[in-house]
């Protein structure tokens, strides 16, 4: 009965030991155990009662069962294994005295060392061994996290650098697999559309970041109007084509821009021509709307300065087509005449439409002068200095400065369209020559 009570009390006593006290208790005993087994057992029995706890040694001096249990190495492990089934956590803290009292080989790697140091061991193992694993995970996280700014810089680099990523030279052209569910002929037409607009409006040797923002935006809007299914890749296509042009220039290749045969076809050329025609009509319509709005904001006044400006426009080699004639009220000599504005001297190469000559019939001297101006322009398609001097006294409908600037923008647009169509014709001719 007393043995069981002391054995049950023993784990609580051993669990009260701190790890530092246990190590101090075990280190001299391990040294004694390496010298000889008899001295270790004697010192273990003596030190076991004295170093475990002073209170326990004083309270157990009269009982002969406790020294026998501590002195005998065979009884202690049996009792401890039975106690280990009851309280495994306290057992691990309690076993160091048993290992100190046991044999010389077992205490160094006993359950006490694993009990007290198992947590420390695993804690220490996680500290020295986890840095390689954690550093590996940190490195992977670092590369993933730092990959974002690095990829962003790579994404920004083509805007500032000429040839940063050489792999996407003709990425949009050659990647027909990306256009699943889309018409490949329209994709070819879209690529040629972008190429032509870039050739006419941008400097091909300048990166997209240094190009005028309004021109880039205008090309993107044109692409979205004519090819709405490819509007997301318009900017990327512009950037890729500019890079390929710079690369060709760097490699000393000819910049005549021959279209590769696999990137064009007759159907794609037809789609391209229809898109260009539609875009030209829409641009002309926008210009006419701007002119009409500006003419309503500022009434037309007869002035010599305006006549000089219109005479300067007369010498332009390009003229407005018949579709540019718009119907708006014209204030001349104080009378309101609702007639076609013929832009008199502007149409130097085109005959005015039949509706223009019939629409000018109104009352008043102003109508006669406007009719005379229209007939003068119809009879003199290419004005010479003599004809200009003779037609100067004839009063014509004048334009405001805002209208003149808008007309000049329209003229520039038609020039670009004409050059664009000329390039398209050259490319078609080259395509026919290449196939034949």
Swiss-Prot record:
Protein name, as recorded: Nucleolar protein 4-like
The UniProt record lists the keyword Signal: no
Hydrolase as UniProt keyword: no
GO CC annotations, alphabetized: cytosol; nucleoplasm
Residue spans of biased composition, Acidic residues class: 160-169
Gene: NOL4L
InterPro entries linked to this entry: HTH_NOL4, NOL4/NOL4L
Phosphoserine: residues carrying this PTM: 130, 295
Ranges of Low complexity composition bias in the record: 41-61, 375-396
Origin organism lineage: Eukaryota, Metazoa, Chordata, Craniata, Vertebrata
Composition-biased stretches (Basic and acidic residues): 170-184
Highest taxon of source: Eukaryota
Segments of skewed composition (Polar residues): 351-366
Record key words, sorted: Phosphoprotein
Annotated region described as Disordered, given as residue ranges: 1-184, 351-400
């Amino acid at each position: 009965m007393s043995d069981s009570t002391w054995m049950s009390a023993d784990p609580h006593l051993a669990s009260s030991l701190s790890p530092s006290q246990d190590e101090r208790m075990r280190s001299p005993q391990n040294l004694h155990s390496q010298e000889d087994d008899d001295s270790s057992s004697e010192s273990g029995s003596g030190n076991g009662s004295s170093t475990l706890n002073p209170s326990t040694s004083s309270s157990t001096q009269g009982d002969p069962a406790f020294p026998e249990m501590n002195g005998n190495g065979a009884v202690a492990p049996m009792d401890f294994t039975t106690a280990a089934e009851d309280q495994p956590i306290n057992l691990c803290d309690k076993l160091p005295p048993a290992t100190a009292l046991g044999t010389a080989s077992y205490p160094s790697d006993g359950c006490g060392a694993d009990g007290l140091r198992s947590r420390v061991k695993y804690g220490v193992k996680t500290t020295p061994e986890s840095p390689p694993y954690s550093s590996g995970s940190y490195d992977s996280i670092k590369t993933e996290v730092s990959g974002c700014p690095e990829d962003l810089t790579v994404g920004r680099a083509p805007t500032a650098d000429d040839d940063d990523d050489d792999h996407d030279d003709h990425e949009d052209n050659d990647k027909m697999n990306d256009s699943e569910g889309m018409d490949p002929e329209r994709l070819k037409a879209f690529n040629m559309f972008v190429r032509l607009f870039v050739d006419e409006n941008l400097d091909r040797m300048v990166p997209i970041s240094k190009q005028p923002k309004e021109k880039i935006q205008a090309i993107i809007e044109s692409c979205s109007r004519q090819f709405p299914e490819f509007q997301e890749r318009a900017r990327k296509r512009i950037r890729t084509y500019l890079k390929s042009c710079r690369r060709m220039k760097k490699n000393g290749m000819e910049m005549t821009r021959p279209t590769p045969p696999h990137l064009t076809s007759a159907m794609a050329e037809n789609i391209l021509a229809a898109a260009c025609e539609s875009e030209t009509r829409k641009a002309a319509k926008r210009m006419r709307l701007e002119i009409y709005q500006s003419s309503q904001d500022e009434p037309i006044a007869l002035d010599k300065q305006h006549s000089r400006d219109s005479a300067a426009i007369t010498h332009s080699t390009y003229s407005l087509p018949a579709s540019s004639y718009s119907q708006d009220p014209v204030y001349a000599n104080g009378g309101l005449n609702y007639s076609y504005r013929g832009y008199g001297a502007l149409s130097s190469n085109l005959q005015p439409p039949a509706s223009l000559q019939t629409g000018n019939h109104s009352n008043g001297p102003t109508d006669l002068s406007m009719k005379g101006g229209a007939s003068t322009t119809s009879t003199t398609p290419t004005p010479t200095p003599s004809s200009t001097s003779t037609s100067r006294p004839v009063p014509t409908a004048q334009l405001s400065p805002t209208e003149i600037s808008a007309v000049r923008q329209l003229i520039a647009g038609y020039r670009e369209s004409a050059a664009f169509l000329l390039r398209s014709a050259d490319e078609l001719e080259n395509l026919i020559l290449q196939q034949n």
